[in-house]
């Protein structure tokens, strides 16, 4: 592994996104979409992948298996088995509440999750807002309590390999990610 590959690995451990790495290393004025995907491809080629860990909601007082998950590059190993060969769907939540994006999008996300479950799908939510109903522990089969970013959503898709991704119910943030174009 060359020194630039080691720097890439260390940058991921330190919390830099593929987008930030592309912007600082490749070109601040270049084609950011293309360069972001180049960094992603190189990272995956080197096996630099996020680990999925459970959020410990009981301060280690006793063993607890929650469906609250997060991704990190700081450790290795996985706390879950992925739904790769199962019927599953990812729903992108609304993120933070703000003017123009509020509880109505959370209501849509919750309804999408409930409908998916009624149809026999394992439900996977990606959302980082603890004030939403969609992040309640019993609302979905898995909750990735993580950022709604292009990189993070693609990481979940790569690991879980869902049958589909519902983008349209979460409001502007998920709609702006253009996830569909990345997998064409």
Spell out what each predicted region is.
Residues 14-15, 33:
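Residues at alpha-helix boundaries and the short loops/turns that link adjacent helices
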Residues 11-14, 20-27:
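Extended, domain-scale alpha-helical bundle/helix-rich regions
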Residues 19-20, 51:
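Residue-level signal for secondary-structure boundary elements
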Residues 7-9:
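Short, recurring structural edge motifs at helix starts
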